[in-house]
Amino acid sequence: MAFAPDENDVLLVVDVQNDFCPGGNLPVPEGDRVVPVINALARRFRHVVLTQDWHPAGHQSFASSHAGRQPYEAIEVAYGPQVLWPDHCVQGTPGAAFRADLDIPHAALVIRKGFRPHIDSYSAFFENDRKTPTGLAGYLRERGLSRIFAVGLALDFCVRYSAEDARRQGFDVVVVDDACRGIDVGGSVKATRESFASLGIATARADLD
């Protein structure tokens, strides 16, 4: 689908941070290529929200926090399965910073997530325990923003969880494919697209070329 944002739309820019781009600790293939697309898209939107992965050192989701475990293994934690990741987006480190070429001066809000040591957080709306809200849903409703355009990294984790939670919260959701990249762990990109279709999450292309 093609699109033209209106006053009730918001651009949700997910985790465009150094550690998720080439050269970072948890790079998404071609993650840096979303930046110029997102910059151009953002100029179409009056309302923009950013998310930022913001982990303390020793976070439960880090493989290094579990003796004998390797990145991309899964373990069981209090709220269910947890994929273990390389250390990434540690608070105050260069890897946690937004990409320097991300140019969205009118972004109104930054949602930091994953800062609780024992709960991971993929979604912009809820921690992975599925009970702890970030406050984003209320922020959007208070401003009459009813349709979310989701972009960023990684398509099959933080973008996916954010889009799904937004849909379940009653928002209309569009994922802009060419402004996302996936990491694809065990077929997770395919599963993401199937989930979007089942939940009524639309997809679009910015097609800025």
Model-derived regions, located:
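Short glycine-enriched, charge-decorated loop/helix-capping segments at active-site entrances
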Residues: 22-31, 124-128
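Short, hydrophobic/glycine-enriched beta-strand segments
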Residues: 9-16, 20
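Short, flexible loop segments at boundaries between secondary-structure elements
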Residues: 174-189
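Active-site flanking residues adjacent to catalytic metal/cofactor-binding acidic residues
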Residues: 14, 52, 177
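Active-site alpha/beta core segments
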Residues: 36-147
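Short, well-ordered alpha-helix to beta-strand connector turns
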Residues: 8, 45, 106-107, 170, ...
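Histidine-anchored nucleotide/phosphate-binding helix
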Residues: 37-41, 159-170
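Short acidic-hydrophobic, aromatic-tinged amphipathic segments that line or gate anion-handling sites
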Residues: 202-209
